[in-house]
Amino acid sequence: MFIASAYAQNTETSIEHIKKVAEHANRVFPPFDFVHFSSHFFWLAISFGFFYLFISRVIAPRIGGVIETRRDRIASDLDQAMRMKQEADTVVETYERELAEARLKAHTIAQAAGEELKQKAELERKEIEERLEKKLADAEKQIAKIRDKAMQNVGSIAEEVTLGIVKKLIDVDINKETVRSVIKTANY
């Protein structure tokens, strides 16, 4: 029973609905009805006017302000970037100039140190040469003294040996002065 009454109620609603649809089926959709064209055009013009005023007075200035702010920010950023680039270029130029000066100074110092070392080495070499020449001269003097002393001894020994040889070989006595003069002429 309960199901039958609900179904019956539902069936009546469907029939009423079909009757209402049939009434409206012959009518035209209101936006497409040319009878109301002037009213539609009026409200279109008023809506467009409100939208135009709203966009021109509220939205366009805001968008313009945002665009102007963005343009100003971009210009500011470009100016700042240009300024920073100029500062960086100045720093690089200063760095390169100071580096070149430091290299030149280092080269000058190295040359001066090299020249100083050359001069010191030359002075030391000359001093050593002078000392060596002095020692060599002293050594030559000592050698000459020793040679002269040895030659004096050799001369007397040679005289005695010569006298002894001559006496043994030919059994003749010779004068010492004769032997001495012969030995001197033979040595020099």
UniProtKB/Swiss-Prot annotation:
Keywords from the UniProt entry: ATP synthesis, Cell inner membrane, Cell membrane, CF(0), Hydrogen ion transport, Ion transport, Membrane, Transmembrane, Transmembrane helix, Transport
Segments crossing the lipid bilayer: 35-55
Predominant subcellular localization, coarse grouping: membrane
Similarity field: Belongs to the ATPase B chain family.
Function: F(1)F(0) ATP synthase produces ATP from ADP in the presence of a proton or sodium gradient. F-type ATPases consist of two structural domains, F(1) containing the extramembraneous catalytic core and F(0) containing the membrane proton channel, linked together by a central stalk and a peripheral stalk. During catalysis, ATP synthesis in the catalytic domain of F(1) is coupled via a rotary mechanism of the central stalk subunits to proton translocation.
Gene3D superfamilies in the record: 6.10.250.1580
Subunit structure: F-type ATPases have 2 components, F(1) - the catalytic core - and F(0) - the membrane proton channel. F(1) has five subunits: alpha(3), beta(3), gamma(1), delta(1), epsilon(1). F(0) has three main subunits: a(1), b(2) and c(10-14). The alpha and beta chains form an alternating ring which encloses part of the gamma chain. F(1) is attached to F(0) by a central stalk formed by the gamma and epsilon chains, while a peripheral stalk is formed by the delta and b chains.
Translocase among keywords: no
Name of the protein: ATP synthase subunit b 1
Keyword set includes 4Fe-4S: no
Protein's cellular compartments: Cell inner membrane
One GO cellular component, as annotated: proton-transporting ATP synthase complex
Entry membrane topology: Single-pass membrane protein
A GO MF label: proton-transporting ATP synthase activity, rotational mechanism
